[in-house]
């Protein structure tokens, strides 16, 4: 069963059900202003005709962007990354950060992208959506314990045309998808004495 992601919803081709992704502000790939509670995305330039995620450890980033969520529905992309590079095709972004789980259990994740992407939680692949393709959605699950967890979303864009990168989550017991936002997964605040 492979769900197909549309801008605000994900249609399950097999069941006909529509688990809606709540409307959230559409974001860019990020900004150059450091966000200490968000994701840092290192930007890499790729060779034309790259057809899969690169081995990032063999590349040197040209800059970084920061964001607390990945909500870039399918759209055209010609603006590049102001302040970093004007590249709008043949690039990759390797996002990484941490998030906090208060409620342990089975979390469902949704990753929609055009072109390839991969989601890692605590260095384990949860979703593999790699390759050159139009917008495509994959889902996966992770059993998470209370505490801090590492998250990584690797993404690449091949030839110019459209882009998309949406990361959704459903907490244990939730039916509806929501956009994953690091600001909703912060550690508890400890008051100072």
Summary of predicted features, one role per range:
Residues 8-16:
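Hydrophobic h-region of N-terminal signal peptides that target proteins for export
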Residues 1-7:
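Sec-dependent signal peptide recognition
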Residues 3, 16-17:
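Short low-polarity hydrophobic stretches
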